[in-house]
Amino acid sequence: MAVISMKQLLEAGVHFGHQTRRWNPKMAPYIFTERNGIYIIDLQKTVRKVDEAYNFIREVATQGKKILFVGTKKQAQDSVKEEAERCGMYYVNQRWLGGMLTNFQTIQKRISRLRELEKMEADGTFEVLPKKEVSKLLHEKEKLERFLGGIKDMKELPGAIFVIDPRKERIAVAEARRLGIPLVGIVDTNCDPDEIDYVIPGNDDAIRAVKLLTAKMADAVLEGNQGQSDAQ
């Protein structure tokens, strides 16, 4: 039994690709037809590919490894945060800071600074500092929280990365590939599927499509976590 149905995919508009003039020929195997200058994705293939990605993510979670959800485009930001939080995983939904994976130690220092500022705010240190100083520190904290809030508990590199639109997230994809971290991704008709280990052919521009597919990956994590606790 497939984890997602054609009906769900159709209702969410997962089948709408990009305009035909903006395409990557490597996506040809996943294209069903062309309609009014737009490529239509073959949803039978998407159903199979979602199954493969789901099984892989579930397996990673069963092994106790973490998954990093990445989607910084407007249409993905809310879904990425909500679904990653729902399954207790990490996320980046604002901007990918170069080196988030390849320069992990430096990023850890920035996270330590964020924790330090949070502690200062919680233990009353801010109350005894001059207003101007506090305002500066709060601004610094907000900025760090915005970019690093979703990975502040990440102590080691993730076991896999789920990415929405590998073209937009090309720096994240390049870093993951360099480190040999497996990639699962929603890949639209204008992307290069060769960069992604588990390709989910689908619309990466519609909020409903992104939400549906991201939620499925979060479900896979939850099922994998359940499998891990059952095994213990």
Swiss-Prot record:
PROSITE patterns: RIBOSOMAL_S2_1, RIBOSOMAL_S2_2. Keywords: Ribonucleoprotein, Ribosomal protein. Gene3D superfamilies: Glucose-6-phosphate isomerase like protein, domain 1 (3.40.50.10490), Helix hairpin bin (1.10.287.610). GO terms for molecular function: structural constituent of ribosome. GO terms for cellular component: cytosolic small ribosomal subunit. The keyword Ribonucleoprotein applies. Coiled coil: none annotated. One of its GO terms (biological process) is translation. Disulfide bonds: none annotated. It comes from the Bacteria. InterPro entries: Ribosomal_uS2, Ribosomal_uS2_bac/mit/plastid, Ribosomal_uS2_CS, Ribosomal_uS2_flav_dom_sf. Belongs to the universal ribosomal protein uS2 family. NCBIfam families: rpsB_bact. PANTHER family: 30S RIBOSOMAL PROTEIN S2 PROKARYOTIC AND ORGANELLAR (PTHR12534), SMALL RIBOSOMAL SUBUNIT PROTEIN US2M (PTHR12534:SF0). This is Small ribosomal subunit protein uS2. It comes from Heliobacterium modesticaldum (strain ATCC 51547 / Ice1). The gene is rpsB.
